[in-house]
From Swiss-Prot:
GO terms for biological process: Golgi organization; Golgi to plasma membrane protein transport; Golgi vesicle budding; positive regulation of protein secretion; protein targeting to Golgi apparatus; retrograde vesicle-mediated transport, Golgi to endoplasmic reticulum. InterPro entries: GPP34-like, GPP34-like_sf. One of its GO terms (molecular function) is cargo adaptor activity. This is Golgi phosphoprotein 3-like. It comes from the Eukaryota. It holds the Pfam family GPP34. A 1,2-diacyl-sn-glycero-3-phospho-(1D-myo-inositol 4-phosphate) binds at residues 67, 76, 157, 160. Residues 176-187 are annotated as: Beta-hairpin required for oligomerization. It comes from Bos taurus.
Length: 285
């Protein structure tokens, strides 16, 4: 009896230790996330989704292009990459039958809250879903592009508006009402142009002055943002202020980057697997 009691206690202690280690890992992931963001901006920390939307917004008008039908799915891809970078989800390890990025399922690593409503809502969906789904399927489900009525519950609604409200709270956007003949629309003009210009310059520098010609040597968040900006069709907005020569160079380098084989690049570093899986999903769609 004594032996069983001690063994049970050791098991309980072991489980508590595992939970403590996992909790500490999540805290470290979030702390690393904060440190990376602080390196970019000492005052304001943005998620990948917020950065993509900010790049897509017209500064004065406060809305994205009516012709852009890519940004919705791009924002959902940003959510998956953000969760992976924060240590909440990961791709299942490759096997003989499942080597390709788009064949491997998205698995839950930790369900501890991130503090971001959209991220935590997605995390709950991923946790509750059986069987597990692939990156491409999750982007479709979160966007609402599914023929299965039982899976419409996974659609994230009003994503752009919710992200815009976050940016309003962070002092980057403001909220206005504009009349468009037949209807009124809520818009979010940019008020903190310094923050947007910092973001634009960061991406411009990544393919010009700081170009390394090797995605494995790039900052992970910068790589992710370039992939998402391309997939969301807002990359041209980033380079539009450049001179003709620099514009051509930047676009060509960005094109070379996103035309790399995700399957090859994804095997080089596990930390960037989700980035390349998201790119592979957009390449296929």
């Amino acid at each position: 009896m004594t032996t069983l009691t001690h063994r049970a206690r050791r098991t309980e202690v072991g489980k508590n230790s595992e939970k403590k280690v996992e909790s500490e890992e999540n805290v470290n992931q979030d702390r690393n996330q904060d440190n990376e963001d602080i390196g970019d901006s000492k005052d304001i920390r943005l998620t990948l989704m917020e950065e993509v939307l900010l790049l897509g917004l017209k500064d004065k008008e406060g809305y994205t292009s009516f012709w852009n039908d890519c940004i919705s799915s791009g924002l959902r891809g940003g959510i998956l990459i953000e969760l992976a970078m924060r240590g909440r989800i990961y791709l299942e390890p490759p096997t003989m039958r499942k080597k390709r990025l788009l064949d491997r399922k998205v698995l839950l690593k930790s369900d501890s809250p991130t503090g971001d409503v959209l991220l935590d809502e997605t995390l709950k969906h991923i946790k509750a879903t059986e069987p597990t789904e692939t990156v491409q399927t999750w982007i479709e489900l979160l966007t609402g592009e599914t023929w299965n009525p039982f899976k419409l519950q996974y659609q994230l609604r009003n994503v752009r508006e919710r992200i815009a409200k976050n940016l309003v709270e962070k002092g980057i956007l403001t909220t206005e009402k504009q009349n468009f003949l037949l209807f009124d629309m809520t818009t979010h003009p940019v008020t903190n142009t310094t923050e947007k210009q910092r973001l634009v310059k960061k991406l411009q520098d990544s393919v010009l002055e700081r170009w390394v010609n090797d995605p494995q040597r790039m900052d992970k968040r910068t790589l992710a943002l370039l992939v998402l900006a391309h997939s969301s069709d807002v990359l041209e907005n980033v380079f539009s202020s450049l001179t003709d020569d620099k514009y051509d160079m930047a676009m060509n380098r960005a094109k070379d980057l996103v035309e790399l084989d995700p399957e090859v690049e994804g095997t080089k570093h596990s930390a960037t697997e989700m980035i390349w899986a998201v790119l592979a999903a957009f390449n296929k769609s």
